[in-house]
A protein has these predicted regions:
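Positively charged n-region of N-terminal signal peptides that target proteins for export
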Residues: 2-6
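Hydrophobic h-region of N-terminal signal peptides that target proteins for export
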Residues: 10-19
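A short catalytic or substrate-binding loop motif that flags glycine-/basic-rich loops and adjacent residues
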Residues: 17-18, 151-152, 347-353
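A contiguous strand-loop segment
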Residues: 21-121, 141-296
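Short, well-ordered beta-strand elements within core beta-sheets of diverse protein domains
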Residues: 125-131
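Short, charged, surface-exposed loops that flank catalytic or proteolytic processing sites
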Residues: 131-137
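Mid-to-C-terminal functional-domain signal that highlights helix-capping/loop sites
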Residues: 288, 292, 298, 302-308, ...
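Substrate-recognition/cap regions that form aromatic- and gly/pro-loop-enriched pockets
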Residues: 323-356
């Protein structure tokens, strides 16, 4: 087992009522053993308490693949099966391609109202793993499939990695007025780390960097046609156009990314106004990736996924809800109202309802 070539897929953990997933990506030159790491926490009280196996197989011409929504179990249709599919266990295949995700939702008018015929995000990940030998190939498989058959989910951030490269692919549909999806994929530099946690993280991207950036041809023109963007092409921000920030997206989602970065690099204090939810549109945008001050071990990454904002302005062990024992955990729901006043709990990376 060559650990320096192994893509380490850590914990797969999803939540129902609140933003609920966290991914941390580590480039191969940012890790101690030369591996790309992906973490995947999903907090759903057991909704995802199983690991699926898709055996490798050869398929005769004319074989059809049934598409069933991975969340609702609703049949969506059929697509032609690939001539050969690879062995997949959970979120990683025999070629060490791994795909995980967090749902950012985005603009509701772009969500599918009647998704019959499209491909949902769970099926899309499985198809990418069954049909690709590299991360780049998986991104092409996934984006080609939604272009041809449609996309049947809300906005998603996908982590797509192999032993050599780690990418973030962000995608959202076009609503009922058009088939397909708009998307952008950015490669994380080998010596950097990145993360996403239920909010779109790709803002501006280099339109000319074909080696490290991929995007739908109409990602900017579609945004213009919907009135989401009016500037120059090089000013375009995927996140601003398709998932505008609000208090929840910053305090409950981007703050988790901030806290992960804060474990491994310096200078994150200046992004507190970006993630505290009080300075929407007026604070400096947190970068998509940062360079860590040290090489990360598997144990370092596992420890970071146990984060409760300790020793930060959002520390859950020190607020009024922590009780006499300084507990970081809170009962659901995330937000509530009492006597006409709204309250909320912090949403850390580590939470008691993690499924696996």
């Amino acid at each position: 087992w060559q650990m320096n070539r192994l893509l380490a897929l850590l914990a797969v953990l999803f939540a129902l009522a609140a933003p609920a997933c966290t991914n941390l990506l580590v480039g191969k030159k940012a890790s101690k053993n030369g591996a790309c790491f992906i973490t995947y926490s999903a907090d759903s009280y057991g909704m995802y308490g199983r690991m699926l196996h898709y055996p490798a197989g050869k398929h005769a011409p004319g074989t059809m693949r049934k598409i069933v929504d991975g969340d609702t179990h609703k049949p969506l249709g059929e697509i032609p099966e690939a001539p050969y599919t690879y062995n997949v266990v959970g979120n990683i295949n025999e070629h060490q391609v791994a795909i995980t995700e967090t749902t950012f939702g985005g603009r509701e008018e772009l969500w599918p109202k009647n998704p019959v015929g499209g491909i949902d995000y769970v099926s899309l990940m499985a198809l990418g793993l069954q049909r690709a030998k590299t991360a780049r190939e998986a991104i092409r498989v996934m984006t080609d499939l939604v272009a041809r058959y449609g996309y049947a989910s809300e906005g998603e951030s996908f982590s797509v990695a192999d032993p050599n490269e780690a990418w973030i692919l962000e995608m959202i549909g076009k609503g009922d007025s058009a088939k397909g999806a708009v998307w952008v994929a950015v490669r994380i530099p080998d010596d950097c780390i990145s993360a996403h946690a239920n909010q779109s993280r790709i803002h501006r991207f280099n339109l000319k960097d074909k080696k490290n950036v991929m995007y739908a041809r109409d990602v900017i023109s579609f945004a213009r046609s919907k009135g989401y963007f009016k500037g120059r092409d090089d000013e375009f921000s995927f996140s601003d156009a398709f998932a505008p920030a609000d208090f929840s997206s910053q305090r409950f989602c981007e703050a988790r990314v901030w806290s992960l970065f804060n474990h491994f690099t310096t200078g994150m204090d200046k992004y507190v106004p970006f993630v505290d939810g009080k300075h929407i549109g007026t604070s400096e945008v947190m970068p998509l990736y940062v360079k860590p001050t040290q090489l990360l071990s598997l144990e370092d990454v596992m420890s970071a996924m146990r984060d409760h904002y300790e020793n930060t302005p959002f520390d859950g062990t020190k607020d009024a809800g922590s009780g006499v024992w300084g507990a970081p955990y809170r009962p659901s729901p995330l937000t509530w109202e009492h006597e006409g006043k709204k309250y909320f709990n912090e949403r850390p990376v580590s939470t008691h309802q993690a499924s696996f």
